[in-house]
């Protein structure tokens, strides 16, 4: 018999703003990969293709999904209560678009403000 303690249990995944709706527009294979990678994060395992995104904020990262097209999922996994999905988008050029970085940063800042106010589920 195995006992799962709270610290062993997967973290919740909380999607901020339109991140879930945006992710749902990904092609099926990219959605499956994103789902698996988010599941890995929830279990405390970093996905195989990710990179830190300090430009978004401390502890922010980017899941990279490659195929015929490139997709990205911005996340924060540093808080004990949940994995926060900040933004999901299709990458159309070599550099991440300024608007995607700014949106990720704005949602990260909103998350910090909500946590300071005791609300652990910002919108």
Region roles according to the model:
Residues 1-70, 79-83, 90-123:
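Basic, Lys/Arg-enriched alpha-helical interface segments
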Residues 74:
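Short, surface-exposed charged micro-motifs
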């Amino acid at each position: 018999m195995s006992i799962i303690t709270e610290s062993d249990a997967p973290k919740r995944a909380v999607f901020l703003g339109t991140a879930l709706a945006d992710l749902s527009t990904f092609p099926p294979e990219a959605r499956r990969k994103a789902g698996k990678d988010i599941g890995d994060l929830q279990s405390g395992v970093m996905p195989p293709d990710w990179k830190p995104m300090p430009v978004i904020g401390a502890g922010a990262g980017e899941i990279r999904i490659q195929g015929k097209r490139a997709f990205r999922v911005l996340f924060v996994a540093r808080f004990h209560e949940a994995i926060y999905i900040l933004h999901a988008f299709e990458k159309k050029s070599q550099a991440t678009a300024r608007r995607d970085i700014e949106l990720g940063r704005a949602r990260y800042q909103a998350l910090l403000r909500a946590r300071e106010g005791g609300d652990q589920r910002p919108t």
